[in-house]
């Protein structure tokens, strides 16, 4: 495609210089740019395609950054980035090294007001901005999808909107989708609440009937007014009960109508709910037909709108931990006919679709409501029914009190399948699963474990149903290096606190969590080049630790390395040091994990190099710390 307009848009001011008639052409160019770029990099595709005209119209009518846009979640901000000076090579590398973030990021641009990545917070943030703003001429526009209205935080914010708040426009992008199909009563009821077509038609018929009454009935006008009041009481949109003036619904793919509507409401003196109807994936046939699959795509996704190339197909990858977990849950579902599975809007990402299809009555997607997912699971467990709550590590933060108060304090045997435990790499700082141990380890009654491969994952899932206590099984979104057995119950149960020695040596004790065992075994081989032999242990459990085994090993190992893909604060290293202190054991401990910083997005090798968790870095850090020999200077691995 030839780009005649987009290359000349370096800021919203350049957009303002275009005539209204040129905006549809610009929208076509933006849509094609996104498809071309993401076919090489992967990223959030369908939501951005669906929001092209809306974002162009917003930037055309308002003046960012003086007028402030707050994107809920932020993964649908690619168009916003293109219109605010980021149509550069960095966009072509989005979510990769030297590329833009896939979410709004203030470090990139002053047009991005907040870091984003989690759902439901835009309205609260926007209200806070409005409360604290000294600029009375600035407009504040939170931009939310309809799925965000199922978030408790959004409803709490709706309850707090002042009726006299001016220049505050809530933009509702209604595509009737979350990542997958919307669930629950709130998203499904939005159209009925705010666009009551039957009542509108009834109003027209009644008014027509009144106008045809005999002219000597002088109270026709009064009667019409009373009818209006009565019908309005029936059709009053939900959002007007919160003091909002409702405008819409507007065709979200007619950029001219969007501009005209926004210009009309721009300076109204009350808060406004601007309702826009869009099609997720609009402009790409495959994405329109299957917006769930095309919500987030990998590089080289199937795309018939571009010229076919030999690489323009889905690449086959090894089976991942989440895929194994989904398969294991299906097997458990057959073995335990009462087993329930709960997820907060992550059925597809956590590979639960097969369970949902096989056992629809035993599967619940609660929508973007992590706290409810946890407490709902607690209620299921209290009834005596086995339950697994599958949830991303980064989203579990949002339900910390629910885990504490409703699960652990009640001593309920909820199984938490904690997906994406580890670095998220391309999704960046808001999605890394490297903080959950910091609060889970402090929860009484909680058993926490992490498998190094699919076989251990299988053992943990099957065994967890026998523990009768709250438990968390953590696993990353990376290939698992061994296949599961696929037997119904092919092993004796593993008990909480059972560790496993992977290899034995005389000089060092290396304790590695989960998939970092693979790195540890590579490091062990590197250390042999220096004449150093290493005992490598997979603790399997972070809580409780295998105290008996550790005490035995520490009688002849005084040099210990802890290796984990988790924050250095509050993880396995912290638990091990507490264990040493409680047992008055002295040891020289090198704790290696994710440093105390927000980790950016990037390719895996780049991020692991940045934080010093490659096998080469770890080897040199061990040599340097324990002074076994003269190592390669560590500074060479940390270039500025």
UniProtKB/Swiss-Prot annotation:
The keyword DNA damage does not apply. Mg(2+) binds at residues 146, 175. Binds 1 Mg(2+) ion per subunit. Binds 1 thiamine pyrophosphate per subunit. Belongs to the transketolase family. DXPS subfamily. Keywords: Isoprene biosynthesis, Magnesium, Metal-binding, Thiamine biosynthesis, Thiamine pyrophosphate, Transferase. Its cofactor is Mg(2+); thiamine diphosphate. One of its GO terms (cellular component) is cytosol. Homodimer. One of its GO terms (biological process) is terpenoid biosynthetic process. Catalyzes the acyloin condensation reaction between C atoms 2 and 3 of pyruvate and glyceraldehyde 3-phosphate to yield 1-deoxy-D-xylulose-5-phosphate (DXP). Thiamine diphosphate binds at residues 75, 117-119, 147-148, 175, 370. Its EC number is 2.2.1.7. This is 1-deoxy-D-xylulose-5-phosphate synthase. Pathway: Metabolic intermediate biosynthesis; 1-deoxy-D-xylulose 5-phosphate biosynthesis; 1-deoxy-D-xylulose 5-phosphate from D-glyceraldehyde 3-phosphate and pyruvate: step 1/1.
């Amino acid at each position: 495609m030839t780009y005649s307009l987009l290359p000349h848009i370096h800021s919203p001011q350049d957009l303002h210089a275009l005539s209204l008639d040129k905006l549809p052409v610009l929208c076509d160019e933006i849509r094609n740019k996104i498809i071309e770029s993401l076919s090489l990099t992967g990223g959030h595709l369908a939501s951005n395609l669906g929001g092209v005209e809306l974002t162009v119209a917003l930037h055309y009518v308002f003046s960012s950054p003086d007028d402030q846009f707050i994107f809920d979640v932020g993964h649908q901000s690619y168009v916003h980035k293109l219109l605010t000076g980021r149509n550069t090579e960095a966009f072509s590398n989005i979510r990769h090294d030297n590329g833009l973030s896939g979410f709004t990021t203030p470090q990139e641009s002053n047009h991005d007001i907040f870091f984003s990545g989690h759902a439901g917070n835009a309205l609260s943030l926007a209200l806070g901005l409005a409360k604290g703003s000294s600029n009375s001429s600035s407009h504040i526009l939170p931009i939310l999808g309809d799925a965000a209205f199922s978030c408790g935080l959004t409803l709490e914010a709706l309850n707090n909107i002042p009726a006299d708040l001016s220049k505050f426009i809530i933009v509702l992008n209604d595509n009737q989708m979350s990542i997958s199909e919307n669930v629950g009563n709130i998203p499904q009821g939005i159209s009925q609440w705010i666009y009551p077509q039957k009542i509108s038609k009834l109003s027209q018929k009644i008014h027509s009937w009144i106008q045809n009454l005999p002219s000597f009935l002088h109270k026709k006008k009064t009667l019409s007014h009373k009818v209006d009041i009565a019908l309005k009481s029936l059709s009053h949109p939900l959002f007007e009960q919160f003091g909002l003036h409702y405008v819409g619904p507007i065709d979200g793919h007619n950029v001219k109508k969007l501009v005209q509507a926004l210009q009309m409401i721009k300076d109204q003196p009350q808060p406004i709910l601007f309702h826009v109807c869009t099609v997720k994936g609009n402009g790409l046939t495959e994405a329109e037909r299957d917006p769930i699959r095309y919500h987030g795509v990998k590089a080289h996704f199937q795309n018939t709108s571009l010229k076919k190339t030999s690489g323009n197909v889905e690449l086959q990858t090894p089976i991942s931990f989440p895929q194994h977990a989904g398969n294991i849950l299906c097997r458990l579902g057959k073995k335990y006919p009462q087993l329930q599975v709960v997820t907060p809007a992550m059925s597809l990402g956590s590979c639960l679709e097969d369970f949902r299809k096989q056992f629809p009555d035993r599967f619940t997607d609660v929508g973007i409501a992590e706290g409810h997912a946890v407490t709902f699971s607690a209620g299921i467990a209290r009834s005596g029914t086995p339950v697994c709550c599958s949830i991303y590590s980064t989203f579990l933060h949002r339900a910390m009190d629910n885990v504490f108060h409703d699960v652990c304090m009640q001593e309920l045997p909820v199984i938490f399948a904690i997906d994406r435990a580890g670095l998220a790499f391309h999704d960046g700082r808001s999605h890394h699963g490297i903080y959950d141990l910091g609060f889970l380890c402090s929860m009484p009654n909680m058993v926490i474990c992490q498998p190094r491969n699919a076989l251990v994952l299988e053992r943990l899932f099957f065994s967890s149903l026998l523990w009768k206590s709250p438990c968390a099984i953590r696993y990353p979104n990376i290939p698992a290096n061994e296949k599961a057995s696929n037997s119904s119950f092919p092993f004796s149960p593993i008990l909480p606190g059972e560790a496993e020695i992977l290899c034995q040596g005389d000089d060092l004790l290396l304790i590695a969590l989960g998939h970092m065992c693979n790195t540890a075994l590579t490091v062990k081989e590197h250390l042999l080049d220096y004449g150093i032999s290493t005992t490598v242990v997979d603790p399997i459990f972070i809580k409780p630790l295998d105290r008996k085994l550790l005490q035995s090993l520490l009688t002849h190992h005084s040099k210990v390395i802890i290796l984990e893909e988790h924050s250095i604060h509050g993880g396995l290293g912290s638990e091990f040091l507490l264990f040493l202190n409680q047992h008055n054991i002295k040891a020289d401990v090198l704790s290696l994990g994710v440093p105390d910083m927000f980790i950016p997005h990037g390719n895996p090798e780049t991020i692991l190099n940045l934080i010093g968790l490659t096998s080469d870095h770890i080897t040199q850090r061990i040599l340097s710390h324990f002074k076994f020999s003269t190592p390669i200077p560590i500074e060479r691995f940390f270039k500025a």
